[in-house]
Amino acid sequence: MHKYLVSLGIYPEYKGYRYIKYAIEHRIKSLGKLHKHFPNEPYSRLDRNIRYVIQQQYDKMSHIVPRPTISSLLSNLIEDYYGNTE
């Protein structure tokens, strides 16, 4: 997780780093729980709402960090946690 955030220019010294890291980890775990209830749905469809929530977290920090590409971040994280996203 740390390497993804740093690759986006979000460093531990930023106020809110821990909050964003926690929010993303929590949403990724929630996606896994959702997938258990809806096993026929691809992760890419289930994570739409999760993407929106995480984007809101980044928007709150947009004045201190560069605007990241949330789709690529989530795709990488989901693939790391669960394998192929489709």
Please place each PLM-identified region on the residue numbering.
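Basic, alpha-helical nucleic-acid-binding regions used in initiation and control of genome expression
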Residues: M1-V6, Y14-R18, Y22-I24, K29-E86
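Helix-loop elements that line ligand-binding/catalytic pockets
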Residues: G9
